[in-house]
Amino acid sequence: EKILVQHETLHQLDIHDTFQYVEDIIEEDTPTLVLFHGSNIAFDKIDLNKSHNRRDFGRGFYCTVLEQQANEWANRLYLRTHTGGKYVYRYIFQQSEELKIKHFATLDKEWLEFVKLNRTVGDIQHHYDVVIGPVADDNTMETVQLYLSDILSVDEAVTRLRYNKVNNQVSFHTPLALEHLILESRKDV
C-alpha cells in the first residue's frame, strides 16, 4: 500500500517536493523505496564492473524514483546503440544503517564539486555505498560543462542551476549496497 501511494504521489509533485519526499522516507526507521532503472539490456543480476565511467556520482548502478525518467533512460540508450530493447526494472531499496549514504537535497556547491570530481577523474571518488541527488542531465548539462571547463565559477554555476528543472538519481556503488536492492520486475517499454 505504501509503495503504491509513493508511486502515485511522486508523479504529482514538483522536484523540490520529490526530494523532500525521498528525504522523509530515508529518515524513517526501516524505510523502503521503490526505484526504477532504464536500460537497453536485459539482465538478471547487476554487475558493477559493467557500469559506465565518469558519471555524476561515479561508477555505479543508477536508478530513479520516477518511472517516467527510467522510461526515458531506456529509450535514450536504445536510440544511442540500436541494440537490445527498452527495459524498465523496478526495485525495492531497503535502507540499512550499515550503508554509508550521501544525500544531496539540491543543486548546490557541494553537489557541483562532487559531480566535477567524479566526471573529471572517473571511477569512484568517494566512500559511499549509495548516493542520492539531482541528475546532471540535458536540463543542467550546459551549465555543468561550462563549470567543468572553468568558464563559470562555482557560484555562477550554482546560481544558473537554481533555475533548472531537475530529475533525481539514486546510485549504488558497492556490493553491500546491491544486497539491499531487490528486483521486483522487468518490463518492456
Question: Which residues does each predicted region cover?
Answer:
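Short, charged/polar surface micro-motifs in flexible loops or helix N-caps
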Residues: 42, 67-70, 95-99
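Short His-Asn-centered micro-motif
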Residues: 37-39, 63-65, 91
